[in-house]
Structures are given as structure tokens and as C-alpha cells.
């Protein structure tokens, strides 16, 4: 059915965009905080895994292992959409991703906000260390 195909394509592209947006955020964190992006054929997977790691004296983990594991399903699906696209879109797989998305988003949002709080505290300490304050 053309309507079902168009719907699946639309949902697939939205799931693709969801993960791509997160990956851009992870890239920004790694570039600005960690210092260097992973490279090689597995860099997308390595980047996601790096988000689960505490980097001593630099930053806490951005994501829990459980969140990263769930996001890895979206990463793998994004790869499928990019490289095989509609030839292999399985409605059940899309439905599975859609069913976990609300709870994943709730958890992911909390973890990202916690990391944002860390960055804000770090910025405050850095400003104070440089003799800057909100009143300067």
C-alpha cells in the first residue's frame, strides 16, 4: 500500500533525524570537552560508547550504559536507513523503536540535563578562577 510505505518512510526518516541530532551533540561534547573524535570504520559506535565513560579530571559519563544500549538500536537503524533505506524497512522494527522512544527520551533528557548542569558548574568555577563573576 502506498500510504503505508509513505508512513514508514516518514517514521524512518524521523528516527534517523532523532539519532543524527544526538550524534551531533555527542560530537560537540567530544570535540569541545574530550579533545578528539574517534576515527576509523567504527567511529559512530565508538562515539556512542565514549559517552558512557567517565574521563578522569575532565568530565563524567554523559549517558548510562542502559541508555547507550537503547540508543545503539537507533544508531544501527540509522545506518540501515542511510545505506539500504526502504528496501529493508521492517515495520515491526520501526514499531519496536517507536515503542521504546517515550521512556528512552525521558531517561535521555534527564541524563543530558545532568551533564548540562555539570558544564554550567564547570563554567562557574572557571569564571571564578579567572576572577570573573556575574557582576563583572
Could you say what each language-model-derived stretch is?
Residues 1-136:
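Solvent-exposed interaction patches of small proteins and small membrane subunits
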